[in-house]
UniProtKB/Swiss-Prot annotation:
Protein name, UniProt field: Nucleoside triphosphate pyrophosphatase
Alphabetized UniProt keyword annotations: Cytoplasm, Hydrolase, Nucleotide metabolism
Catalyzed chemical reaction(s): a ribonucleoside 5'-triphosphate + H2O = a ribonucleoside 5'-phosphate + diphosphate + H(+); a 2'-deoxyribonucleoside 5'-triphosphate + H2O = a 2'-deoxyribonucleoside 5'-phosphate + diphosphate + H(+)
Family: Belongs to the Maf family.
Organism: Novosphingobium aromaticivorans (strain ATCC 700278 / DSM 12444 / CCUG 56034 / CIP 105152 / NBRC 16084 / F199)
GO BP terms in the entry: nucleotide metabolic process
PANTHER family: BIFUNCTIONAL DTTP/UTP PYROPHOSPHATASE/METHYLTRANSFERASE PROTEIN-RELATED, BIFUNCTIONAL DTTP_UTP PYROPHOSPHATASE_METHYLTRANSFERASE PROTEIN-RELATED
Matches recorded under Pfam families: Maf
């Protein structure tokens, strides 16, 4: 069966393609900022899960009987949650703040059918950002901007972003933006993939 990915994320598409999951992608056009404003004092995993559901819901309602996958990732550093950078200058500010600290990356996924959640999860990866010099930050952004403008942590781990870190704990797929192993198990359990 072909699932619907309620996202245009290149990383999520690439993971599903590489794993052999038949899918089509549709945008959900959810106003993430307005949803986040209402989620005061909520953990990173909870925020990512709410956003994943919000992205999947309109697509699920528009595709009766189909399995819809929503996903979201959220970065927290020192208890502060970060959005995608809005400019190169904002990206540099994020990287300066991240320098020498532990980043928590929450990646959530939800499966919906007919507007109802049939499965959801959120996984955590911990990434230790090395101390970044101002020169490195500018050189990094010279090479990676605007490609990282759509990335909450201002990095693509599969590219130059790997140089930001000293240590990573957690699934590589979680760092890429989707708890893929758990998702594959759920798709098999729901009959969307052969077991």
């Amino acid at each position: 069966m072909t699932i619907i990915l309620a996202s245009q994320s290149a990383s999520r598409k690439a993971m599903l393609e590489a794993a052999g999951v038949p899918f089509e992608a549709r945008s959900s056009n959810v106003d993430e900022a307005s949803i986040k404003r209402e989620l005061i004092a909520v953990s990173g995993c909870e925020v990512a899960s709410v956003l994943a559901e919000a992205k999947a819901l309109p697509v699920s309602l528009a595709a009766p009987g189909r399995m819809v996958l929503g996903g979201d990732s959220l970065v927290e550093v020192c208890g502060r949650q970060f959005d995608k950078p809005v400019s190169r200058e904002n990206a540099a500010e994020h990287l300066e703040f991240f320098s020498g600290k532990e980043m928590h990356l929450h990646s959530a996924a939800v499966l919906m059918r007919d507007g109802r959640v049939v499965w959801k999860t959120c996984e955590l990866a911990k990434l230790r950002v090395r101390t970044l010099s101002p020169e490195f930050i500018q050189s990094y952004l010279d090479r990676e901007w605007p490609a990282v403008s759509g990335c909450v942590g201002v990095f693509r781990i599969e590219a130059l972003g790997v140089q930001l870190f000293d240590q990573i704990e957690g699934s590589h797929f979680t760092v890429l933006g989707m708890p893929l192993m758990a998702l594959l198990g759920a798709l098999r359990a729901e009959g969307e993939l052969p077991s």
